[in-house]
Design a protein with these regions (language model features):
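Cysteine-nucleophile active-site neighborhood
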Residues: 245, 250, 254-335, 407-417, ...
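Active-site-proximal beta-strand elements of phosphoester/diester hydrolases
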Residues: 208-212, 322-323, 396-400
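Catalytic beta-strand/loop cores that center a nucleophilic Ser/Cys/Thr
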Residues: 317-392, 475, 482-486
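Short solvent-exposed loop/turn micro-motifs enriched in small/polar/acidic residues
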Residues: 15-18, 304, 370-371, 380-381
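Residue-level detector of beta-strand face positions
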Residues: 23-24, 62, 310-312, 387
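RNA-binding accessory domains that recognize and position tRNA/RNA substrates
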Residues: 2-229, 233-241, 246, 260, ...
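Proline-centered loop/turn at the N-terminus of a beta-strand
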Residues: 125, 208, 278-280, 296, ...
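Short linear motifs in low-complexity or flexible loops
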Residues: 501-509, 518, 525-526, 530, ...
């Protein structure tokens, strides 16, 4: 009798409710059927897929998925439940979720509730039992497209008519729907207690940073704080004049959803900020910087979404495994014509940017608005642009997610690079000493020496922007000096853990290796940096790579 009762309880705990039919219909007529495992309803969005093996809660709560129906390629989702510490926002922004098998009985000590319960609580329509392998292959071959997911109407003809009448993703300003409504501050006191084992922030913030919220993930803001930034997060369309009035040491542009062409309220302000203050962009922020520079943006066939995308850093030759989530990408040739003397002698652009990875060259273009821009990162799967760095103003950006969540942390060094960039850029009004007093960072000797003044044309007040102090940069100013960071060393030597933070936080910037000038370094590090700067003045050919020769070198014929 006792065994029978135990068996019944186990059965009750592992059984799923009676299945309700659900249907997913794509605009090209493809139909995939399954059973409901979330809230009831009918939703429309762009179908996409994510290849992450774990981190489903981070994916579901990522604001960048606004307007989309996500298909998870891993066969079982929900087996470790849901906990609020891992969520990237207060609530999911996605339209719907498609999985092969939904686990209703999670097993993990951190689990607060099951994923099906979480989805129902937040009115997220979800379906299981779908042949996700067939669905992903279809999206891969036919491209991302409009879709409808319904648990209330499963008639194929009816759903097909509805989805073809729905609004496409292109042209929608979804960033405005997930941005904050008013500015707020984020500091060390806002870090979650459950992450006490993680990287500890310095005792005193080194930099004041204004972050544009176009759908920012919590983990990005937390990583900025842990790297020594005191944040003021502002809405997506905050005027540049208001940002400059805060006198920040740097500006961060966050990730976000949807079509970057529709987020003019952000990139029009970024155009006024470039050249006035150091700028770092991630994902949509990368696209905002590109748009500000006049670049073209293309819609990818099915996007990059997952935690296993290989990207080569063209400055170092290292390959990083990255987390990505985007459906649009920068058209690098649209930034300007190549500068042959800084591009291995090549005069013509390549459609497949893996050409530069094979040649070991980080090409430079001459941008009409902001001068020279170097391609720094390339996707090794499809040859698309993954990162750029400006050579004449302090700004850089990447298309992927260095904070991961979920995914690998190979690119975490970029948060350190942002700190080094802010350390190296000094405001002319008041000089290096006043700038150091503002930021709490000792001035770099090389920054106080020879300088190249960089003044944006917008600083004079064009387009309604107020006059702003120009930036002076160490001469020569090279992106390699702050982007060439050893990944392993950054994970260990550059960071403090737990109680160590209080002791190490008081160390000087020089001791922690955040200064961008060669005079702030010692021994082999200074020699290495000098070598990097010398290399930047010559065609970029990395050791161990094929020489810069080919069918199109120096204007050669195909």
């Amino acid at each position: 009798m006792i065994l029978s009762e135990i068996a019944n309880k186990l059965l009750e705990g592992t059984s799923k409710p009676a299945p309700r039919p659900a249907a997913l219909v794509l605009e090209d007529g493809a139909v995939f059927r399954g059973t409901a495992c979330g809230a009831s309803g009918e939703v429309y969005g762009e179908i996409c897929f994510n290849t992450s093996l774990e981190g489903y809660l981070e994916v579901i709560t990522d604001p960048s998925y606004a307007g989309q129906i996500i298909t998870m390629t891993y066969p079982q989702i929900g087996n470790y439940g849901v906990n609020p510490e891992d969520a990237q926002a207060d609530a999911p922004a996605l339209r719907g979720l498609v999985v092969r098998d939904m686990c209703a009985t999670p097993s993990n000590w951190r689990s607060a509730q099951s994923l099906p319960d979480y989805l129902r609580e937040h009115d997220v329509v979800a379906v299981e039992g779908v042949d996700t392998r067939a669905l992903v292959r279809h999206v891969r071959d036919c491209g991302a497209q409009r879709a409808v997911l319904s648990t209330v109407d499963v008639d194929e003809a009816s759903l097909l008519a509805k989805v073809r009448a729905s609004e496409p993703l292109v042209g929608q300003n979804l960033a405005a729907t997930v941005s904050c409504e008013k500015a707020y501050a984020v500091g060390a006191g806002d870090l979650p207690a459950s992450h006490a084992f993680a990287v500890a922030p310095p005792a005193t913030a080194r930099h004041r940073v204004v972050a544009y919220d176009c759908g920012a993930k919590r983990s990005i803001l937390q990583n900025l704080v842990r790297s020594g930034c005191e944040l003021t997060v502002v809405p997506w369309d905050t005027p540049a004049a208001d940002v400059l009035a805060m006198a920040p040491d740097g500006v961060f542009l966050s990730n976000g959803p949807g079509d970057p062409e529709a987020v003019e309220g952000t990139y029009s302000q970024v155009e006024k900020l470039l050249g006035q203050v150091p700028v770092f962009g991630i994902c949509l922020g990368h696209q905002m910087i590109a748009k500000a520079a006049g670049a073209g943006i293309e819609k990818l066939k099915f996007g990059h979404r997952g935690g296993n995308h290989p990207v080569m850093n063209l400055l170092t030759g290292r390959v990083e495994i990255t987390a990505q989530n985007h459906g649009f990408g920068l058209v690098f040739p649209s930034l300007g014509e190549l500068v042959p003397e800084l591009s291995g002698g090549f005069k013509g652009h390549e459609d497949d940017l893996r050409f530069w990875a094979r040649a070991g060259i980080a090409p430079v273009v001459d941008n009409p608005r902001f001068g020279r821009i170097r391609l720094t990162h390339v996707n090794l799967n499809d040859g698309t642009a993954e990162g750029v760095a400006f050579l004449d103003i302090p700004a850089f950006s990447v298309q992927y997610h260095p904070e991961a969540s979920p995914g690998p942390t190979d690119a975490h060094y970029l948060f350190t690079a942002f700190g080094r960039l802010m350390d190296s850029a000094v405001l002319t009004n008041g000089g290096a000493a006043d700038a150091a007093a503002t930021s709490g960072t000792p001035p770099c000797p090389s920054a106080a020496a020879g300088r190249t003044e960089v003044q944006s044309s917008l600083a004079s007040g064009q387009s309604g922007a107020p006059a702003a102090p120009s930036l002076t940069l160490p001469d020569p100013w090279e992106c390699a000096s702050y982007l060439d960071i050893d990944i392993a060393a950054d994970r260990l030597a550059g960071w403090t853990f737990g109680e160590q933070a209080a002791t190490v936080a008081g160390a000087s910037t020089k001791e922690q290796g955040f200064c961008g000038g060669a005079d702030c370094l010692e021994g082999s590090a200074a020699d290495e940096l000098s070598g990097l700067r010398a290399a930047c003045e010559q065609p970029q050919v990395l050791k161990g790579k094929m020489p810069a020769t080919g069918s199109r070198q120096a204007g050669g014929e195909d």
